[in-house]
Curated annotation (Swiss-Prot):
Catalytic activity reported: N-acetyl-S-(2-succino)-L-cysteine = N-acetyl-L-cysteine + fumarate
InterPro entries, sorted: AdenyloSucc_lyase_C, Fumarate_lyase_CS, Fumarate_lyase_fam, Fumarate_lyase_N, L-Aspartase-like, Pur_lyase
EC identifiers of the protein: 4.3.2.-
Function: Catalyzes the cleavage of N-acetyl-S-(2-succino)cysteine into fumarate and N-acetylcysteine. Is involved in a S-(2-succino)cysteine (2SC) degradation pathway that allows the bacterium to recover cysteine from 2SC and to detoxify 2SC that may be a toxic metabolite. Can also perform the reverse reaction in vitro, and has minor activity against 2SC and other small molecule thiols.
UniProt lineage: Bacteria, Bacillati, Bacillota, Bacilli, Lactobacillales
Organism from which the protein derives: Enterococcus italicus (strain DSM 15952 / CCUG 50447 / LMG 22039 / TP 1.5)
Pathway assigned in UniProt: Amino-acid biosynthesis; L-cysteine biosynthesis
Other facts: Is able to functionally complement a B.subtilis yxeK mutant in the ability to use 2SC as a sulfur source for growth.
Residues annotated as binding fumarate: T106, T107, R233, S278, K283, R284, N285
Record protein name field: N-acetyl-S-(2-succino)cysteine lyase
């Protein structure tokens, strides 16, 4: 039983996924650190820094032994050191060859590189699920490419768009997130094995080769120079996670608003027995949308904490280091939940096309004031037409009268245009501009880049 919301049995799946939690638990942390110790011993054995038999024994024990996490945790409390109890346990398990455990390395070498291994596993989940959401959005954008709806600016009705167009904007945004995830991989997944101050002194003249071989075994990149005091790699990863989360939160908030009773254009998936309120039986609340939107703020707080961790004193310290232990698991947990929520929502999203159509007529033609202005402006001039249409629109708005009636009270319109012609101007389905075309352009662009399959 835990005390953090990520670990609370009744709530944790709202804030994370089981798959992501498993990457950041005690067992995973120690397992990755032991993997680094095993790789270090193997590399040092191959390079002659330690006996080959000792290297084989250490690597075998590190990979195959089940260590007592509770006992290690007890020793952490006694020794006031997060890694030494693990080193001691590995040494004891390796017997006489254990004297060569952790040879030349410093704690931060092992912990940082272990964290990168954990982060790589987390990244793979984020990349996979971002791709899943991207593809689901693309499919829906194409499906609803020509479905007209109200476009809103400043929270108010503005001009007609299509639902597919709205979704295509998010498709394009997720495509850029995928590009960013692929772009940062080489920089972020870089280990660090270079000793107490990064000088390789404890490894002797083969220090750089020890690092390269150790990290090659772990399938990580080797740095040009140690990064114990340079935490920008984690900050870059965090920045991309923050961008992905911000898009996810924006979508959650947008869907939340579109599900409002007064708008009612979409609804999140509903299952029989789902309760919206303990006191109002009729409520069908946007719980998934709220959850999706609510997780962005804590992600961004974790991102900020990672950025603060770049402030490192001298060659390294533990103040900024510990902030990463808090922020990296949290941001990955929260964004994994967001991606899972949205993927599930998109699978069962109810799109109410009839309601979208009714909302297009809600202001009795005012939604097409721009169209009227440009049509009339061809004869009167755009600015003169703007003034004329503005006066008609305000009258229609304030008196709650059909826009076409107030327009035909103006001689400049009544004497020039047939009512049937103006009625055509006021058809919202005929004034969505290039919305449908843009859906195809977005999908084609990402197909060309190889992020999206054709069809």
């Amino acid at each position: 039983m835990g005390s953090h919301v990520i670990d609370l049995v009744m709530l944790r799946n709202n804030f994370s996924t089981a798959e992501m939690r498993a990457i950041w638990n005690d067992e995973a942390r120690i397992t990755k650190q032991l993997a680094v110790e095993a790789a270090l011993a193997q590399a040092e054995g191959e390079l002659g820094l330690i006996p080959k038999e000792a290297a084989k024994k250490i690597a075998k024990v590190a990979k195959e032994t089940t260590f007592d996490i509770a006992a290690i945790a007890e020793q952490v409390a006694v020794l006031k050191h997060s890694l030494m109890p693990t080193i001691n346990a590995l040494q004891a398990a390796a017997g006489d060859e254990g004297e060569f455990v952790h040879y030349g390395a410093t704690t931060q070498d092992i912990v940082d590189t272990g964290t990168v291994l954990q982060l790589k596993d987390a990244y793979n989940i984020v990349l996979r699920d971002t791709q899943v959401v991207f593809e689901k959005l693309a499919k829906l954008a194409k499906h609803y490419q020509n479905v007209p709806m109200v476009g809103r600016t400043h929270g108010m009705q503005a001009l007609p768009i299509t639902f597919g167009y709205k979704l295509a904007i998010w498709v394009d945004e997720f495509g850029r997130h995928l590009e960013r995830l692929h772009e940062i991989k080489e920089r972020v997944f870089t280990g660090n094995i270079n000793g107490a101050v990064g000088s390789y002194a404890s490894f002797g003249p083969k220090g750089s080769e020890v690092e390269r071989q150790t990290l090659a075994i772990l399938d990580l990149n080797a740095p040009t120079i140690g990064w114990q005091s340079s935490r920008d790699r984690f900050s870059e990863y965090a920045s991309v996670i923050g961008l992905i989360s911000a898009t996810l939160g924006k979508i959650g908030n947008e869907f939340y608003n579109l599900m409002r009773t007064e708008i009612n254009e979409i609804e999140e998936p509903f299952s029989k027995g789902k309760i919206g309120s303990s006191t109002m039986p009729h409520k069908r609340n946007p719980a998934a949308f709220e959850g999706l939107a609510s997780l962005t703020p804590p992600v961004l707080k974790s991102v900020a904490l990672i950025h603060e961790s770049m402030h490192v004193e001298h060659e390294r310290d533990a103040m900024s280091w510990r902030q990463e232990w808090v922020a990296l698991p949290e941001m990955n947990a929260y964004v994994s939940a967001q991606l899972a929520i949205l993927a599930n929502v998109l699978d069962g999203l109810q799109v109410k096309e009839a309601v979208m159509a009714r909302n297009l007529e809600k202001q009795h033609g005012l939604l097409l004031s721009e169209k009227v202005m440009f049509e009339v402006g061809q004869k009167l001039g755009k600015q003169t037409a703007h003034h004329l249409v503005y006066e008609c629109a305000m009258t229609s708005f304030e008196e709650e009268r059909p826009f076409i009636d107030t327009l035909f009270e103006q001689a400049a319109i009544a004497d020039t245009y047939a009512r049937a012609e103006v009625e055509q101007w006021l058809d919202p389905t005929q004034y969505t501009g290039l919305c449908a075309d843009k859906v195809d352009e977005v999908l084609a662009a990402w197909q060309t880049k190889g992020f999206l399959k054709e069809g």
